[in-house]
Design a protein with these regions (language model features):
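Hydrophobic small-molecule pocket/channel-lining residues, especially in calycin-type beta-barrels
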Residues: 1-140
Length: 140
């Protein structure tokens, strides 16, 4: 089960919804492919991600596409063993302003059955804010 929480602006009440995420290892176990379905802001949501560890660069790399837009988000970052997390940094084109914006994603392993993803990006004032949180719980 995936619990989604989204914030439109700092201090505003969040929007919550649920969905399903299916992860599978592909191409000889080199890549994790994620398929996500649910509702977001009252609309059907579908997204696909690919996460991999680049042995040459020594970082994780992630790509993401969904039905809320037409762009592809690319992010990369290191694993932190002390916090059991990956901090991914990347850019995405804002469809409203047609300018590239910085985004940050923190992906944490809570335990064997729970993972947490937090997405940060620019708010209306241009300052970084927490935009989304996804809590993934393994189906038993």
């Amino acid at each position: 089960m995936t619990e989604m929480t989204m914030w439109e602006k700092p201090g505003a009440p969040p929007t919550k919804s649920t969905g399903t995420t299916v992860n599978k290892m592909v191409l000889g176990g080199r890549y994790q492919e994620s398929s996500n379905t649910g509702t977001m802001m009252g609309m059907p949501f579908e997204g696909h991600g690919t996460l991999a560890y680049d042995n040459a660069k020594k970082v994780f790399e992630n790509s993401w596409v969904d039905n809320m837009g037409t762009g592809v988000m690319y992010m990369s970052g290191p694993w932190d063993a002390a916090t059991k997390s990956i901090t991914l940094l990347g850019k995405m084109t804002d469809p409203a302003s047609l300018t590239e914006k910085d985004f940050r994603e923190v992906f944490k392993v809570i335990d064997d059955n729970t993972q947490l993803m937090e997405m940060y990006g620019p708010g209306y004032d241009g300052k970084e804010m927490k935009m989304m949180e996804l809590k993934f719980t393994r189906k038993k």
